Amino acid sequence: MARRQATAGGLTRLAIAVAIAAGLAGCGTAGGETTGRLLGGGRDAFQARLAQLRGRPVVVNQWASWCGPCRAEFPYFQRLARKHDKQVEFVGVNSRDSRDGALEFLGKFPTPFPQFEDPNAEIARSFRGGRAWPTTAFYTADGQLNYTHQGSYGTEADLERDIQRYAVHG
């Protein structure tokens, strides 16, 4: 009896993970804007997304609508995500923000990459974020966290340098 319950629990968790991954399958950078769209699911959905992207390096940008430096650097991420769309994946994480503020922000700054809602900074803490805004994390193609940059990028060239160093050649 206990074995059946354990197996059923494992199958339930597997089914949830598969459903999350299937729901995220259309959220990549190849193509459309994700204006005004925030993905839920918390840390599990974020980790499922990273697992789905294995084989390509990933840049994760943690931001909030109330963060001035986030607003200043966000256009860099918009442009560089388009520039690197064949070799690097980008993911946004909106942490400790109101849903209305985040949606308004995304209306002004549409992105070609998915954005996760992270009201308690649970996702951000998984990549050493959640303490400073903005924070950018770089994952290698095999899914390992390579580097976390806390604070804003002063120039697009600075962000490009870190993309090359920690994502492309990481």
Put a short name on every predicted segment.
Residues 107-112, 119-167:
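Thiol/disulfide oxidoreductase modules built on the thioredoxin-like
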Residues 36-58:
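A short beta-strand-turn-helix
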Residues 23-26:
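C-terminal motif of bacterial Sec signal peptides marking the signal peptidase cleavage site
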Residues 59-60, 90, 136:
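Hydrophobic beta-strand anchors of alpha/beta hydrolase catalytic cores
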Residues 28-30:
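Bacterial signal peptide processing site
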Residues 71-109, 119-125:
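Structural microenvironment flanking redox-active thiols in thiol-disulfide oxidoreductases
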Residues 2-15:
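Bacterial N-terminal signal peptides that target proteins for export
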Residues 56-58, 63-66:
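Short pre-active-site segment immediately N-terminal to redox-active cysteine/selenocysteine motifs
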